[in-house]
């Protein structure tokens, strides 16, 4: 019987990072290992329901130190605009003393981290191992975060001529550039210094990029598999959404969710709404209020609600995304190609239309649309603007069962989904991942 280990987990202060770390923690706990999960105090309540093994996974709350310019009480990226992520990153670095005190007191065998590049050096001082666990796509790391890499420039030996940035991606690169220098240093330093690199992906989707990363860093790369969240069967789909969706034919409704960190300018928000209207299809749009508006209703185009009242809803709050995707009426999922959302998309039966906003989302979108041809990307102008016509046309192209594009992406998506949900694939990844940890670290 293999020895059991005690792991620390210290993810970036974003729910899009903390939740995938917790999914991995659940898999480790399921195999009898212990996990101490370090996170901001306020985040604990929102994550507790994701902890399936509370006897084996213990939350260790941290006090987020004040940083000049960071709003008081801000602890996660959900509390701030993307432009302030750099300051939250500084706050994360200032928790080092708290993290080291926990290490001294609890003596873990290894530490999983992503942005805290100082973890490997600290771990070595205490004779424990470090794992750089990357939850963004391997394509992003391979393209942008290899030694000597530059934002937007394909590195020598990069294994794809399709999964890359183009002229019209300036908007995504500009958004990241505010945060990029610090982020690049954090991730590459962590990858260089850690004992093992772990990626949340599978070779069936990103194998050539994982191999490239391993060669670039001269390190063992372990894959966890996609780490789909456990379905929450304790709560059914909210009645308001079940009632609304059940009023339409199977596979006829478009569900659009641009991501929790995306706050659109009012004109782009309205164009998004008008694009959904222009499809002529029933839709549910879950989106944050536009910049300058306190509610989504304030930002809607004039006369919009009246025109779509029988077939469309714009909602500014949280929704049960996995349960909505599983509803038989949903036929198309329009999303930002975030690292968690895209895996949910791939194992659903919905057609996929992608509107990436950040650089990592752009690269994974290209992987989906051009390497695998399982989705369609909404065209943009250089400014990042997408028109109602471009959105509507993309949606209609995949929803039309008789169109060449619709047939192609539907067929390819079905094939890829069959691979990802094949019996034993995901459990096999977890088994091999744990074996790899024990062979290389414990």
From Swiss-Prot:
Keywords: Glycosyltransferase, Transferase. Pfam families: UDPGT. It comes from the Eukaryota. Its EC number is 2.4.1.-. UDP-alpha-D-glucose binds at residues 260, 319-321, 336-344, 358-361. Transmembrane segments: none annotated. The keyword Transmembrane does not apply. The keyword Nucleus does not apply. InterPro entries: UDP-glycosyltransf_plant (IPR050481), UDP_glucos_trans (IPR002213). GO terms for molecular function: UDP-glucosyltransferase activity. It is an enzyme of class 2 (transferase). PANTHER family: GLYCOSYLTRANSFERASE, UDP-GLYCOSYLTRANSFERASE 79B7-RELATED. Belongs to the UDP-glycosyltransferase family. This is UDP-glycosyltransferase 79B7. It comes from Arabidopsis thaliana (Mouse-ear cress).
